[in-house]
Swiss-Prot record:
It comes from Salmonella heidelberg (strain SL476). Pathway: Nitrogen metabolism; nitric oxide reduction. This is Anaerobic nitric oxide reductase transcription regulator NorR. One of its GO terms (molecular function) is DNA binding. The keyword RNA-binding does not apply. Residues 187-416 form the Sigma-54 factor interaction domain. One of its GO terms (biological process) is phosphorelay signal transduction system. InterPro entries: AAA+_ATPase, GAF, GAF-like_dom_sf, Homeodomain-like_sf, NorR, P-loop_NTPase, Sigma_54_int, Sigma_54_int_dom_ATP-bd_1. NCBIfam families: PRK05022.1. ATP binds at residues 215-222, 278-287. Residues 481-500 bind DNA. Keywords: ATP-binding, DNA-binding, Nucleotide-binding, Phosphoprotein, Transcription, Transcription regulation.
Amino acid sequence: MSFSVEVLAGIAIELQRGIGHQDRFQRLITTLRQVLACDASALLRYESRQFIPLAIDGLAQDVLGRRFTLEGHPRLEAIARAGDVVRFPADSDLPDPYDGLIPGQESLKVHACVGLPLFAGQNLIGALTLDAMTPEQFEVFSDEELRLVAALAAGALSNALLIEQLESQNMLPGSSGVFEPIKETHMIGLSPAMTQLKKEIEIVAGSDLNVLIGGETGTGKELVAKAIHQGSPRAVNPLVYLNCAALPESVAESELFGHVKGAFTGAISNRSGKFEMADNGTLFLDEIGELSLALQAKLLRVLQYGDIQRVGDDRSLRVDVRVLAATNRDLREEVLAGRFRADLFHRLSVFPLFVPPLHERGDDVVLLAGYFCEQCRLRLGLSRVVLSPDARRHLLNYGWPGNVRELEHAIHRAVVLARATRAGDEVVLEAQHFALSEDVLPAPPAESFLALPACRNLRESTENFQREMIRQALAQNNHNWAASARALETDVANLHRLAKRLGLKD
């Protein structure tokens, strides 16, 4: 068997049919898996000595959440170094990164593997991996034919990365124009809620607006702040972190604004505060709702006039700082209760973001579980850590009141338990390794001023409410439109029309 012109043309046509990069990537690897009759295929992006899965076919869903470092995966390191088609013999002693991750074949190891490095010019930008349980599966294809496949995949990935960079440059003045792939932010998730959040981050990152990040405890608000900073013109300067909840009132002002020698007992020298440290960069104030009203007033002055005063000093210092603030409180309620200044709230919430709770993110739970499994594998020096099908279902059925942080701890604990009950360096996580209650119900969605921004009129408010209702229904029903329509008690055709009118569908 060999590739015909018709086969290659068919692959190219499938790429053109895709709507958006992700759809094109999925069409590419699905078509390749069919053409090559292999058991699994994956398109990976290369960045910072690791491969990041972009699209998979025939592999467990949690693979999309894993990050494959070169140091931890010798086969992928060989692909990255080769510069050409890499064929691994069936008896290769190099472990395959997908062992145990092909559904229905969890107990078997991959026998045939081909790796195709993908280049943009001289730069490695990714790889295409093809795996089969039959040892001789890829012998009928020549290296030249596989190079043609690699060229098609490299073109699709290179175009996607270039468009991504150009879109970013439109928001970042002074960009160099040199091809530089956008950096990974570890914001893992493909659910509608996370896709929307990522879009909002892209919109606001390139501006210099202050941002208020809301969400339940453990949802990943700090990661959002890092992503905003990383995508901003200030990314070359520091991102300074301060947890306001951990600040005793007696030292809070000094931590924020600094102090001069002799300002108080123990002030034995001049000391810069967080605002000075973050000059020309970004200051992330976590749990900002915990600040006292007196400190809120001083923080407001910095946001208004851009100057600070060290404790014990009469002089003012100019600072250029972007403030990102996070809270798990409803600050609008805090304002009404007199515990938070209304003027500071409005200064901070120019562009509010809301990080969705984990129970609203659908299958993102499995992707995140894969990410934490890979972290545990590297940390404990194991050859593999995989989730059984029962374990995946168990994780999806749980409500996760502690959100992503609870999931991370649950995975780490389960790996330790599973490792203790099984000899060797291969760990399979089963449902019984997780101390989770099956009857835990998802926490009710957080009512937040962040979920729906202030609107000018009734129509705009109604449309925003409808958008949020549809997004939540889709997230809770794994993006199944028919199931979402039933949950909303409406006809599916009407739901599609409404979603198009509201800009939720093309």
